[in-house]
């Protein structure tokens, strides 16, 4: 099975609880104004990577994986296979989607149902640039909701009240940025020029 991938950060603390393997899918049918990853909207682009190769990139010691985009549920079959394999390894799964949970649960395709079944934390709803969220860590706008689909995580965990973080990595002549800055720094972050790396590059948590 091949996954159409825009970006991977093998180990990050800026995309969910604990140290996580973060993967951004290439392609999204939604067009949220102010999307922080407009280069990930087109389904053409990115890299087609075998599921086994993606799993081989997950380093030891991470707590879980986070799936972003693009739109993970536009790649439900591959995303579900990755999430299932991660859960079999004892890893948690966090998914950011621009769709609403209710709409996803109403879908009839088995892949979407399986992806939901393998998800511990679902952040749903389209990003709204007019409603930036500065109170909840990792969440782009106040209309987006956090669903704890398993008992593995809790809403009262202090990690959700901490400040957003931005990670910057220098890889040769490239700067790789991921995460989401505090609101006052957003303009500066948006103004940066970022160059794509082979499978790891700038991304944000908004959908």
Per-range role (PLM):
Residues 74-94, 132-174:
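P-loop/Walker A phosphate-binding loop and immediately adjacent motor/lid segment at beta-alpha junctions
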Residues 120:
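Receiver (REC) domain switch/active-site residues of two-component response regulators
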Residues 163-207:
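Charged phosphate-binding loop/patch that engages nucleotide di/tri-phosphates or the phosphate backbone
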